[in-house]
Amino acid sequence: MKTKLVLLGTGTPNACPNANGPSSAVVVGDRAYIVDFGPGVVRQASAAYFNGIDALRPDLLTVAFCTHLHTDHTAGYPDLIFTPWVLERPVPLKVFGPKGMQHMTDHILKAYETDIDFRINGFEKANESGYRVEVTEIES
């Protein structure tokens, strides 16, 4: 089974027009594991998919790891939760991260509850599981 490391973003906390926020993907066979989710993570995964890395098709993004809770490493988290769901991810996102990851996740889901309700019950019905997140906090 072949393993690849794909750099999805190598930016810093500074707004740089030529670099997306910190994010990588470890691709093992046909599975992708996202590591950190800086701004642009889903767009960059989509670009990698269109350049031949099938495992980075956005609706297949189902497992992610967060190294730490700095904003430059997490600002793309709502995008990682919701965009693949809108694109019909059928299962919850599994996220492994430090203490505080569950708290952050709960607040993101709360902030977007109106959108979630609209997408589940509105005109273009989305599935009821793809926006959910299963968090495992890892003690450091």
Language-model segments: what does each one mean?
Residues 1-140:
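Binuclear metal-dependent hydrolase catalytic cores
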